[in-house]
C-alpha cells in the first residue's frame, strides 16, 4: 500500500490567488511469486490506484500481469514472457510497472487509458565471451486510433519495440 499527497494549484472559482491544496493518490499492490521447479518461475501482480482530483470525479486505475520466467541451470539460453492488462481513467491515475529487459537495459513504462501489453525476452550465451539478447514488446490500446503526438505520432493503436544486443567480453 502506498499513499502520496501532491500539491496542486486549485482554483475552481477563478480567484485572484490560486490556493495550493494536497491532492491524494493511493496505490494498492499485491504480488505472487511461485517457483514451479528449478527452471520455471511464475509471477503475478495486481495493482489498483485511486486519485482524487478534488474538482472532478475521482480517477481509478487497474493493472494486472503474469510473468513466465524460464532459466534452466547449466543451459546457454533463458527467457521470459509477460502478458498484461491495464485500464485507467486518465493519465493522473497511471500505473508504473518494471519490466525485464536486455542486459544493462531497463524499462519502467507508465500505463494509462485501456489496453494490453506483452513482451518476450530471450538470451543465448554462445560462449563465456559472447552472448546475445533480444526483446520484443508491444502495447495495444483498445480505445485509441492514434498514439502520441507531434513527431512521435503513431497512426494506429499498436506501439511496438525491438531491442537486440550482442555482448563480447574480452
Language-model features, listed with the residues they occupy:
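Exposed, low-structure sequence patches enriched in small/polar residues
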Residues: 1-170
Amino acid at each position: 500500500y502506498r499513499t502520496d499527497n501532491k500539491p496542486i494549484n486549485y482554483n475552481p472559482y477563478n480567484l485572484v490567488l490560486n490556493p495550493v491544496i494536497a491532492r491524494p493518490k493511493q496505490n494498492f499492490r499485491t504480488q505472487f511469486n511461485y517457483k514451479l521447479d528449478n527452471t520455471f518461475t511464475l509471477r503475478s501482480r495486481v495493482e489498483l490506484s485511486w486519485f482524487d482530483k478534488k474538482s472532478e470525479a475521482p480517477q481509478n486505475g487497474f493493472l494486472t500481469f503474469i510473468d513466465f520466467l524460464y532459466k534452466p541451470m547449466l543451459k546457454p539460453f533463458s527467457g521470459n514472457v509477460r502478458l498484461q492488462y491495464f485500464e485507467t481513467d486518465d493519465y493522473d491515475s497511471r500505473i508504473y510497472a518494471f519490466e525485464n529487459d536486455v542486459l544493462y537495459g531497463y524499462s519502467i513504462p507508465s500505463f494509462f487509458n485501456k489496453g494490453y501489453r506483452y513482451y518476450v525476452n530471450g538470451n543465448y550465451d554462445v560462449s563465456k565471451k559472447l552472448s546475445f539478447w533480444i526483446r520484443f514488446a508491444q502495447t495495444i490500446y483498445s480505445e485509441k486510433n492514434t498514439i502520441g503526438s507531434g513527431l512521435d505520432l503513431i497512426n494506429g493503436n499498436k506501439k511496438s519495440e525491438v531491442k537486440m544486443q550482442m555482448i563480447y567480453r574480452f
